[in-house]
């Protein structure tokens, strides 16, 4: 829905989807679509889940980085997030070649082989924070914060990139909201409002 709104209100913006069906694409393929089309921005939309935990809540966004939480507990939290998001790598037959520089299952992660461009990092973080503001305002969902972590699909892209976690499907009330017409309307509106604020800031830079 967000793409449709953007197309109608800003015909100058070309919206490219990595997929429009439930057909599985590897993380590498998703990033490659963006890179091949020289995209100015990459947004990956996900639904969160925690096994055996039914109380976790919140809309979250991620940009590429080492993870801002420190200490032994913090390192484990950072690693757990990266492992959840990167775990699909191991479903790919050639993952050892494609992701040679990314260990998605290590307890301590060597996150960045190269430091991403300052401009991309700055823009990614800015959009991440806008998403937190606008999506939570539109939906009334709990603000889970803007975070940094070693997520493969972000590392593989060559432009400002963010990953969004709409909520926890493992928490009944969050799952219920994501399946309502209200959720289907207000999440896209929040995405759109954040995108427009981002576009206004960086359109000609």
Give residue spans per PLM region.
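Active-site-proximal helix/loop segments of hydrolytic enzymes
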Residues: 1-205
């Amino acid at each position: 829905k967000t793409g449709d709104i953007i197309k109608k209100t800003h015909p100058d913006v070309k919206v490219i989807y990595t997929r429009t069906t439930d057909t599985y694409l590897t993380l590498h393929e998703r990033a490659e679509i963006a890179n091949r089309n020289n995209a100015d921005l990459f947004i990956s939309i996900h639904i969160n889940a925690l096994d055996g935990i039914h109380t976790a809540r919140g809309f979250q966004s991620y940009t590429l980085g080492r993870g801002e939480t420190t200490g032994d507990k913090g390192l484990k939290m950072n690693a757990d997030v990266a492992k959840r998001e990167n775990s699909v790598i191991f479903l790919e037959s050639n993952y050892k070649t494609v992701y040679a520089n990314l260990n998605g299952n290590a307890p301590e992660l060597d996150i960045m082989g190269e430091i991403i461009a300052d401009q991309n990092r700055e823009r990614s973080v800015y959009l991440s924070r806008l998403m937190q503001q606008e999506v939570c305002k539109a939906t009334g969902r709990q603000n889970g914060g803007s975070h940094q972590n070693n997520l493969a699909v972000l590392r593989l892209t060559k432009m400002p990139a963010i990953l969004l976690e709409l909520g926890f499907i493992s928490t009944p009330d969050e799952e219920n909201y994501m399946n309502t017409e209200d959720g289907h309307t207000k999440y896209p509106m929040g995405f759109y409002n954040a995108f427009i604020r981002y576009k206004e800031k960086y359109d000609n830079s």
